[in-house]
Swiss-Prot record:
InterPro entries: DapB_N, GlycerAld/Erythrose_P_DH, GlycerAld_3-P_DH_AS, GlycerAld_3-P_DH_cat, GlycerAld_3-P_DH_NAD(P)-bd, Glyceraldehyde-3-P_DH_2_arc, NAD(P)-bd_dom_sf. NAD(+) binds at residues 11-12, 109, 167, 300. PROSITE patterns: GAPDH. This is Glyceraldehyde-3-phosphate dehydrogenase. GO terms for biological process: glycolytic process; lysine biosynthetic process via diaminopimelate. It catalyses: D-glyceraldehyde 3-phosphate + phosphate + NADP(+) = (2R)-3-phospho-glyceroyl phosphate + NADPH + H(+); D-glyceraldehyde 3-phosphate + phosphate + NAD(+) = (2R)-3-phospho-glyceroyl phosphate + NADH + H(+). SUPFAM superfamilies: Glyceraldehyde-3-phosphate dehydrogenase-like, C-terminal domain, NAD(P)-binding Rossmann-fold domains. D-glyceraldehyde 3-phosphate binds at residues 138-140, 193-194. Pathway: Carbohydrate degradation; glycolysis; pyruvate from D-glyceraldehyde 3-phosphate: step 1/5. It comes from Saccharolobus solfataricus (strain ATCC 35092 / DSM 1617 / JCM 11322 / P2) (Sulfolobus solfataricus). HAMAP family: G3P_dehdrog_arch. The active site is at residue 139. One of its GO terms (molecular function) is glyceraldehyde-3-phosphate dehydrogenase (NADP+) (phosphorylating) activity.
Amino acid sequence: MINVAVNGYGTIGKRVADAIIKQPDMKLVGVAKTSPNYEAFIAHRRGIRIYVPQQSIKKFEESGIPVAGTVEDLIKTSDIVVDTTPNGVGAQYKPIYLQLQRNAIFQGGEKAEVADISFSALCNYNEALGKKYIRVVSCNTTALLRTICTVNKVSKVEKVRATIVRRAADQKEVKKGPINSLVPDPATVPSHHAKDVNSVIRNLDIATMAVIAPTTLMHMHFINITLKDKVEKKDILSVLENTPRIVLISSKYDAEATAELVEVARDLKRDRNDIPEVMIFSDSIYVKDDEVMLMYAVHQESIVVPENIDAIRASMKLMSAEDSMRITNESLGILKGYLI
């Protein structure tokens, strides 16, 4: 049983913590939180041990939330830390992980240099085996890599061109925007997503463009892939349909808008209405000779959660990629095939 700490209990951290609890080979030893907000109160009510920075102890105790210790105490009780702190904060914690000789999993908001390897379970699990510091790439990059590495099973991917429509903020981020604008992110090519993909697939010819849209629900990707060989649509459909962590959305569902997909998640009784699978619109798949085009939705709050679980096992050399992904998928109810 691996003792896992989660440093940072926000959008990603609380989901990763819940996923750890569901794993047969992991124990959540506690979470680190900086402010006694509603997330901390709910974690306490659920019996999760809460650790805080030294300077925050009094604030938590005055709020009525018992403190199990400092963040350093939490790190010491663990075998490995999943760092889900805000962008850039993980790099500030790395010297502590080094000093205490603890493995750590970082998130895509950190620069690639913070870790020994950038990680996508479907693409490079084996390369990450035994790496002390692993960076799980961002939500958008995770979706790109899942799709690219899956299509690559049919024929070698030679070139990728993708346009990303990014959500402006997560649903709880009330101080972010835009509210009534489309914002290039940035107005240059490529966006940072291409470089992030290349941190995993080093020599891939990829260019990306991105725009921020006034929505909170999901991202959307529009992707054009050039393959080494001529392929048929049925082969692309087959590999997408048979790869876990990818689901197909058929037009017969009459649910193609991202808001409708959230409603589907509600009706399916998904935890927090999460859909960690890449949601590919099956009717968007276009294949001609060596060219593949498709569009898909990305639930930014949950897509990286299974990757974090697999990254833990890879870092600790617990099992093979196939076994880890199977256990993760089964424990979290992650699907393949059609969503409904």
